[in-house]
């Protein structure tokens, strides 16, 4: 959909994730409790044995009460995630203003938007692998530094090429912040207490994710788009010192030789996964906008990307420390969780993109007012996140809450199709609330089902794998939604009696449909004509909602195949928090 569709290709990694993983010598899925009971010593990443009391009764005594250092470190991680979530969703709405100011072309705008998402996507499994080999903190510090530098480069840019460079650096850093904060949270908490800290972290993440478009619109309209970059610096300045001074994790034993340490990494696997994902994602991003779906520019890289990823999958059976170990797929619960994560990403990211647009296109609200209309949904999401912290102990597990979350999300997504031209204020404000509640409940209870991934050394790899699949699901969901929008709009506008002349002439090209939304409030056409155009837009959004309802229902089906996990284990990750 041209320039406007480029804006739709935004990152929206707005979920909370943590995996529960334990060390076991065999390959059968077991609970954390079993894993702790059956081992008298825990083997660290470097092969060093840790006495049993450090992993058994001692943990039971220490974990219920958290120290001040733990709490401050957690606040630092949550603050860093808030910055990442705001930045991830702020650019899309401001990109037309940036392109106009810097005289950027459509292709440059495309890369400015895609580079952030793509770099964050491909680097998540890489950062996770590095953190497993060298410890969590060094790559986290590097990620924060890259994000900080990228924000400055973006803020001072004088041309679109510099904007792209800044977004690439921010993508590298943001992807690391996202995955490593999740991994560290899993290391720091037991399975029983994890829902509490997931709920606490969900609050700044949900607020940041929804605030992003409003921040972008406010700066682009009333100040300068450069503040989208500058505002990251003081916000990151809150979280970084807290993490640096108070995050005390058990170090990973390293060899004296740098070469031996570097040999721990699966270099070939990293190259294959980065190249494969990049080649595969690019045609998904430009299909229907830069090139048609049937063009060789779309099909050739798509098939090449699949081929490289297949090679990567087979190759990962060879390294001693693969980036994606095959043992991660030995659990039915883990596999169903991955499928659920993909579907969750598709539904969430698509609706985060198109919900504000239905307010602007059908209800004729400005970008800022559309964000205000979604505030009740944000508030409910935060409340549900807080309540969910208590639900897991009450239910005695995650499975039934997970299924309830999918039911609520399916119903809430279906209700969005009730939007209509001239809907009442109560309808406009209330329809997305159930969807928001389902999203909040699901994001907190989906990922802990990865308890069947049992090797404690695989914590980072498993989370990196999940976040990559979830983000990839979001990109696929956006592609599906954009294709639906194009197809339905083209068919529906042709079926109306509206003459696409004068101020409506741009709508002859479906690529202009989203960009034209801003003009709907002021076009000089008869009321009946505008009403017909608005109903064409409405039909596009309703079809997207119907499709996402189906995907949500499929997610509910996946939850029927997951097994309950034991909440009584007090086991922590190898790189656990230490006083």
Curated annotation (Swiss-Prot):
Described purpose of this protein according to its UniProt entry: MFS-type transporter; part of the gene cluster that mediates the biosynthesis of sphingofungins, bioactive molecules acting as sphingolipid inhibitors via inhibiting serine palmitoyl transferase (SPT).
Family recorded in the similarity comment: Belongs to the major facilitator superfamily.
InterPro entries hit by this protein: MFS (IPR011701), MFS_dom (IPR020846), MFS_trans_sf (IPR036259)
Keyword Hydrolase listed: no
Localization, UniProt: Membrane
Native species: Aspergillus fumigatus (strain CBS 144.89 / FGSC A1163 / CEA10) (Neosartorya fumigata)
Keyword annotations: Glycoprotein, Membrane, Transmembrane, Transmembrane helix, Transport
Start-end of Basic and acidic residues biased regions: 51-62
Gene ablation phenotype (knockout): Does not affect the production of sphingofungins.
Membrane topology: Multi-pass membrane protein
Annotated region (Disordered), positions in chain: 17-62
Biotechnology: applications noted: The sphingofungins A, B, C, and D, show a limited antifungal spectrum of activity but are especially effective against Cryptococcus species, fungal pathogens causing opportunistic infections in human.
Listed name of the protein: MFS-type transporter sphD
Glycosylation sites: 335
Residue stretches spanning the membrane: 73-93, 110-130, 138-158, 168-188, 200-220, 227-247, 267-287, 294-314, 338-358, 367-391, 398-419, 429-449, 460-480, 541-561
GO molecular function, one term: transmembrane transporter activity
Cellular component annotations (GO), alphabetically ordered: plasma membrane
Primary site of residence: membrane
Gene: sphD
Induction context: Expression is not regulated by the sphingofungins biosynthesis cluster-specific transcription factor sphG.
């Amino acid at each position: 959909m041209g320039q406007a569709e480029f804006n739709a290709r935004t990152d929206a990694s707005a979920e909370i994730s943590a995996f529960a993983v334990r060390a076991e010598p065999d390959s059968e899925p077991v609970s954390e409790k079993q894993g702790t009971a059956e081992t008298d010593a825990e083997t660290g990443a470097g092969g060093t044995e840790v006495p049993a009391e450090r992993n058994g009764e001692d943990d039971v005594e220490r974990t219920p009460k958290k120290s001040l250092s733990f709490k401050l470190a957690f606040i630092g991680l949550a603050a860093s995630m808030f910055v990442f979530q705001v930045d991830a969703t702020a650019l899309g709405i401001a990109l037309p203003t940036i392109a106009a100011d810097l005289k950027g072309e459509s292709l440059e705008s495309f890369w400015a938007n895609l580079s952030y998402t793509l770099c964050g996507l491909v680097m998540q499994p890489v950062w996770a692998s590095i953190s497993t080999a060298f410890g969590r903190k060094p790559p986290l510090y590097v990620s924060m530094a890259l994000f900080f530098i990228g924000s400055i480069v973006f803020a001072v840019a004088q041309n679109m090429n510099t904007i792209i460079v800044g977004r690439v650096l921010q993508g590298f850093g943001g992807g690391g912040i996202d995955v490593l904060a999740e991994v560290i949270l899993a290391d720091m908490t037991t399975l029983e207490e994890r829902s509490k800290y997931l709920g606490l972290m969900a609050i700044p993440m949900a607020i940041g994710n929804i605030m992003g478009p409003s921040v972008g619109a406010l700066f682009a309209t009333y100040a300068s788009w450069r503040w989208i970059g500058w505002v990251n610096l003081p916000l990151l300045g809150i979280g970084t010192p807290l993490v640096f001074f108070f995050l005390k994790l058990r170090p990973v034993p390293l060899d004296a030789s740098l070469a031996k340490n570097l040999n721990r990494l699966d270099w070939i696997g990293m190259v294959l996964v980065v190249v494969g994902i990049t080649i595969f994602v690019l045609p998904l991003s430009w299909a229907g906008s830069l090139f048609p779906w049937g063009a060789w520019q779309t099909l050739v890289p798509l098939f090449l990307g699949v081929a490289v990823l297949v090679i990567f999958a087979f190759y990962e059976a060879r390294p001693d420390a693969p980036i994606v170990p095959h043992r991660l797929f030995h659990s039915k619960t883990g596999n169903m969780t991955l499928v659920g994560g993909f579907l969750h990403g598709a539904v969430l990211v698509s609706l985060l993109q198109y919900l504000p647009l239905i307010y602007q296109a059908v209800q004729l609200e400005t970008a800022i007012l559309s964000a205000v209309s979604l505030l009740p949904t944000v508030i409910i999401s935060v409340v549900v996140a807080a309540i969910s912290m208590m639900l897991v102990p009450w239910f005695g597990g995650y499975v039934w809450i997970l299924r309830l979350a999918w039911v609520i999300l399916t119903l809430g997504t279906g209700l969005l199709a009730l939007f209509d031209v001239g809907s009442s204020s109560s309808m406009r404000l209330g329809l997305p609330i159930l969807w928001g509640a389902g999203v909040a409940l699901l994001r907190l209870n989906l990922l802990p089902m990865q308890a069947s991934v049992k090797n404690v050394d695989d914590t980072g790899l498993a989370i990196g794998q999940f976040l990559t699949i979830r983000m990839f699901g979001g990109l696929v969901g956006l592609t599906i939604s954009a294709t639906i929008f194009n197809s339905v709009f083209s068919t529906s506008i042709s079926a109306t009696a509206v003459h696409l002349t004068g101020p409506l002439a741009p709508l002859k090209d479906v690529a202009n449909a989203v960009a034209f939304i801003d003009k709907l409030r002021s076009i000089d056409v008869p009321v009946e004509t505008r009403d017909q155009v608005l109903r064409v837009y409405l039909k596009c959004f309703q079809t997207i909602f119907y499709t996402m309802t189906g995907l949500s229902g499929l997610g509910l089906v996946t939850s029927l195949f997951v097994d309950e996990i034991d909440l009584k284990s007090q086991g922590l990750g190898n790189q656990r928090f230490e006083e």
